[in-house]
Swiss-Prot record:
MF (Gene Ontology): rRNA binding; structural constituent of ribosome
Keywords linked to the UniProt accession: Ribonucleoprotein, Ribosomal protein, RNA-binding, rRNA-binding
PANTHER family, per database record: 50S RIBOSOMAL PROTEIN L9 (PTHR21368)
Protein name as catalogued: Large ribosomal subunit protein bL9
Keyword hit for Ribonucleoprotein: yes
Highest taxon above the source species: Bacteria
Protein family according to the UniProt entry: Belongs to the bacterial ribosomal protein bL9 family.
GO biological process: translation
Length: 148
């Protein structure tokens, strides 16, 4: 019997896969636990529509991320940090601080975990990488200006 998996099932397949299962296994295990449904023409049509909509949505998200990456590319984030005479900062600048400044200066929400950088402890200019989507990232600069 052909069935459509509604959830990931070990040793059978992933959600959305159409597989062959024995009649007893499908009726007595997969259907009662809502792990699968019968692969009728209507159900297959619905599944194909869902997959097409997901594909379109991912493509739109990818294009939006690429446009955002082009906008943010080589932008400079300026930070005024209290520093001593030798340029060493009182405290440190972390990815959380940079994410807040990106939101403030460019009105773009970026998760702090998506910013690849070392903690900044000395005034200067630093290169960072911002990951906007799994395959899309952009380079930015952080300029730390010492303030007495």
């Amino acid at each position: 019997m052909k069935v459509i998996l509604l959830q990931d099932v070990k040793k059978l397949g992933k959600k959305g896969d159409v597989i062959n299962a024995s009649d007893g296994y499908a009726r007595n295990f997969l259907f009662p636990k809502k792990l699968a449904q019968e692969a009728t023409d209507n159900n297959l049509h619905i599944l194909n529509n869902k997959k097409e909509n997901e594909r379109r949505q991912k493509l739109a998200e990818l294009e939006a991320a690429q446009a955002l990456a082009a906008d943010l590319k080589d932008k400079v984030i300026k930070i005024d940090g209290k520093a001593g005479d030798n340029g060493k900062l009182f405290g440190a600048i972390t990815s959380k601080d940079v994410a807040g400044l990106i939101k403030k200066q460019f009105n773009v929400e970026v998760d702090k975990k998506k910013i690849v950088m070392d903690t900044i402890k000395i005034a200067g200019t630093y290169n960072i990488e911002v990951k906007l989507y799994p395959e899309v990232s952009t380079k930015m600069k952080v300029m730390v200006v010492p303030v007495q």
